[in-house]
Amino acid sequence: MCSSDLPMPHLRYNRVFFYDLPGPPLGSMTFIDAAEPMLPKRVGLLTTTQFRGWLPAIQAHLEKKGHVIRIGEPDRRVAYAGQLLGCDYHTATVVEGDVDGYLYIGTGDFHPLGVAILIDKPVIIADPERGTARDLKEVRDRVLRQRHAAIVRAQDARVFGIIVSKKIGQARMGMATDLKALAEKHGRQANLFLMDLVAPELLQGYRVDAWVNTACPRIAIEDILQYKQPILTPQEFEIVLGERTWNDYVFDEIRV
């Protein structure tokens, strides 16, 4: 077990404890070799905490094949180099200028999808469970089409519900009040909804034309089909109001 004296955002405690559990052993490089032909020369390595111990060996393996590897240092929201959270992509953005694409070590799209949307560079997933690799471009493009459709649907909305989380690490009341003021500047009505659990069934029955989510950034992405009204990220709300263009689209993050 290790502890950190650094305060984390929105936490009630100044001292946070991390239980450092060992990850699974790295048995084979088959899944890395499956990804290697899809990789550019300069690659940023990314993963979750489960596979973080594999990164040095994978880095050495790819460097022997001629790749230049970068592993981004963590910020105050993550503990390990190369680690991704669903709402924090610092270890990817900090090396963005030094790489031409990314290799994510893990299963599923949840963590690397945010990087693929945030940064216009290839993201390849190397899946150690299946022993396979794939490009995330098709999934990224599908999600961006969904986001564009949500923005278009919200263009004529007059009343917005701005969702604010009470959860530690997700509370962004300052952002929510700024967005409310921005809506009113453009002649729209906006009301704040302070919630512990954000779920579509808890938001039914309100006279709201569209939702703006300042809680976990992935709610608008992962749960979009569960909401009758369009649900936007803060940056998408700025596009609806004309404060930002689609060409300046960025993925929402919770950062220190």
Identify what each model region corresponds to.
Residues 193-196, 210-215:
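A conserved acidic, glycine/proline-rich C-terminal tail/linker
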Residues 10-11, 19-23, 129-133, 217-256:
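Peripheral docking tails and interdomain loops at the edges
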Residues 110-189, 197-205:
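Redox- and metal-dependent alpha/beta enzyme cores, enriched for Fe-S-associated oxidoreductases
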Residues 51-57, 169-172, 200-201, 220-221:
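Short, charged/polar "capping" segments at the starts of alpha-helices
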Residues 8-140:
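Conserved, well-structured core segments that form the ligand-binding/active-site neighborhood
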Residues 42-45, 89-102, 142-156, 212-218, ...:
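A polyampholytic, Gly/Pro-enriched intrinsically disordered region
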